[in-house]
């Protein structure tokens, strides 16, 4: 990766969240293969340590791999992580916010049956269950979890001479996917966007969800919480990029990858999917910030 050579001239340190399997694990492997020391994090310590061993067995240099437990939904998780990074590395150069959940429970057998009926339109309401509790957990992981992680690790990123943050997002969070014009405008007005205004939109979403008014109020109905969590993440990325011009901050849709969150039904391998977040993590100095990428192409937030 020639374009990353100048950035990698010095020893670099990265944190990847939600990294014990799938896309996160592959991102760790690809970064470590470039000589970056990667701190793999996961909710489950046992699975995280097993993931480290898996990377070592694949030929990754063990000197480029570290592990620390992190549950992005638990504020108490972050103090020990930050202390570990400060003591071990003294700084942080790369943060990849990959941890995420779908916010739905899928009836896999019913979905497979629907797919087998060629030509039949799938009734996703019949195969995907959405509840208020799931919606709340989804927002806490996919949006607030990213905020917690960034807030906790920002002081360490500011010790780097070229810090960058990559937020793994999805094109379902593009504004054009949101039916309600008022919601689109609120999340898309970059001049007026603040963290507080984005938080307020999510509070409104949860109230409408609890009252059964998702469709009526113009929210996405397909994987509602997941979609709006990614839309909020995209807006938050734009807010951060304006607030911290010295940090390269972007979000990326890696494509539909064969991972658990996509029921292994994607058309891209994890190797292909991880390539775009890794490319953003290793972008050369002076690269653009505050953008949304669909794989390797810049895509309008709208």
Curated annotation (Swiss-Prot):
Molecular functions (GO terms): oxidoreductase activity; oxidoreductase activity, acting on the CH-OH group of donors, NAD or NADP as acceptor
Tissue expression notes: Mainly expressed in flowers and flower buds, to a lesser extent in leaves and, at low levels, in stems and roots.
Biotech and industrial use: Soapwort saponins possess anticancer properties and are also being explored as enhancers for endosomal escape in targeted tumor therapies. They may also serve as precursors for vaccine adjuvants.
Enzyme Commission (EC) number: 1.1.1.-
Residue pairs linked by disulfide bridges in the UniProt entry: none
Binding sites annotated in the UniProt record for NADP(+): 20-23, 43, 71-72, 98, 226, 230, 257-262
Listed Pfam families: adh_short, adh_short_C2
One GO cellular component, as annotated: membrane
Keywords per UniProt: NADP, Oxidoreductase
SUPFAM superfamilies hit by this protein: NAD(P)-binding Rossmann-fold domains
Known pathway: Secondary metabolite biosynthesis; terpenoid biosynthesis
UniProt-annotated catalytic positions: 226 (proton acceptor)
Function as written in the Swiss-Prot or TrEMBL entry: Component of the oleanane-type triterpene saponins (e.g. saponarioside A and saponarioside B) biosynthetic pathway, leading to the production of natural products with detergent properties used as traditional sources of soap. A dehydrogenase/reductase that, together with UGT74CD1, mediates the conversion of QA-tri to QA-triF; UGT74CD1 may transfer 4-keto-6-deoxy-glucose to QA-tri, which is in turn reduced to D-fucose by SDR1, thus leading to QA-triF formation via the initiation of the C-28 sugar chain.
PANTHER family: (+)-NEOMENTHOL DEHYDROGENASE, OS02G0640600 PROTEIN
Record-given protein name: Short-chain dehydrogenase/reductase 1
Gene: SDR1
